[in-house]
Amino acid sequence: MNDFGEEDERQILEGTFVDKSSKQTTNDNENNNNNNNREEENENQDKNVTTKNDEDNNNDANDGDDDDDDLFGDKDLEENDNVNSDNEKNKSKKDKEDQDQEEQQEDQEDEEYSNKKKKKKSKKNKNRHSTEEDETMEDANENLDFATGAGEEEEEEEPELIRDPITLTHIETSNVLPAQKIMKLKLLNILGIQPKPFDPITFEDEEAMNGDEKSKFNVESVIRWRWGLDLNGRPAKESNTRLVTWSDGSSHLYIGNEVLEIKEQPLQNEQFYVYSSQDGFIECEGKIDSRLSIRPTNIKSKVHQRLSENVAKRTVKVSKIKSIHTTLDPEKEKEKREKELLDALREKKKQKDDSYRPNRGRGGKSGSLTASYLENDDDDYDSYRNEKGDDFVVDDDEDEEDDDYKESDDDGSDSSDDDGSESGESESDSDGDNKSKKKENKNSNDNKNNKSRKQDFDDDEDEDEDLIVSTKKVKRRVIDDDDDDED
């Protein structure tokens, strides 16, 4: 591992760091290789020199005359000097060649590093979503890889896709004049355009089919065109619309007798183009330069009046809320009806209760005190007594008379007591006979009503029984006293 200082880290982040240790190691290796090659060459040269010397000696031996001339070996020394000089020259050449190779290698490495850096930068420019931090980190990683020798492999280039050639044909458009200026127009509900040529035969059918579109604008405010004949008898296009530009720069659109004001606004920051589409591709016709806005000339114009009428008609048809005019408060009317219903229910219930209630003097409500009312009351009570199976009649008036009669017997003489007792017995017997006859005559008529009235008397049954028992005791006591007097 290489130890990097603060300056090395700063150079790595800036992308200017160069690893010297790796270059030194590579240079040392190359120098060692060169030295080894040089030693081998020197050995070969020495061998060649020795072989030459041997050959020369052999030649000298053969030629004795020559040996005599060269007794001190000057020739050999000269030849050795020449060989050494040649070797030195060769070494200097090889050193120069080695230096040149080293310089070339360094240049190649620098070029490769710069090329890699350029590729990385081009990729970073293409990737718009990368941030500055990512770029700095990538540069640092690249420098580290290059310094340590880890990123020496060349990046694989993406293979180019070879696609089938596309044959483009010009899109045939309508034979119109070339547009000098293309403008954008937004259609409002006061204006319509009919792209099909006008035909008086099919006009009514088309308008009937396009009822929804017809409701948006009037027939008179629709831009139309048709085929006609010019002065030379050739077919030409005719339209009911004219665009007039005045000297002051203002423009008006005439549709028949209708006049509309036009204002042009340039498109500054917007980019709109007109395209002609075809299967597989589209063809650009031109750029939209400006926008047109159309409006009525004034409020009193026919177009504006017709538009307001159509809007009013649509609002009347579409409105679903219905209003009702009334002078009475619905809440009070509702309370009044509820009160009347409650009163009717109370009256009905009251009548029903009165129909089931008996006509008695004791207890419930009664009518006026007439003879018939009193007789009916007695009859009701007598019928109730007959149902109980008791023939004894209880009468409060008779009890009071008996009590008075008893007191008179105590105060008077014995003869008067006998007369009073006989007269009291005779009166009681006569009254009992008369009442029994009346009972027999009325029992037949009252039995039918007794069943319905019996239920109403169930609550008063206990009180009636107590009253009957008390009256029996009083009556019997009086009769027993009379019997004792007779004895």
UniProtKB/Swiss-Prot annotation:
Positions with biased composition (Acidic residues): 56-81, 98-112, 132-142, 392-431, 457-467
Coiled-coil boundaries: 331-357
Residue spans of biased composition, Basic residues class: 116-128
Biased composition range(s): Low complexity: 27-36
Keywords (A to Z) from UniProt: Activator, Coiled coil, Nucleus, Transcription, Transcription regulation
Gene Ontology, cellular component aspect: Cdc73/Paf1 complex; nucleus
GO-annotated molecular function: RNA polymerase II C-terminal domain phosphoserine binding
InterPro entries assigned to the protein according to its UniProt record, in alphabetical order: Leo1
Keyword Nucleus annotated: yes
Region Disordered, residue ranges: 1-142, 344-487
Record function comment: The PAF1 complex is a multifunctional complex. May be involved in both initiation and elongation, histone methylation and RNA processing.
Stored PANTHER family: LEO1 PROTEIN, RNA POLYMERASE-ASSOCIATED PROTEIN LEO1
Record note on quaternary structure: Component of the PAF1 complex.
Family recorded in the similarity comment: Belongs to the LEO1 family.
Stated name of the protein: RNA polymerase-associated protein LEO1
Organism: Dictyostelium discoideum
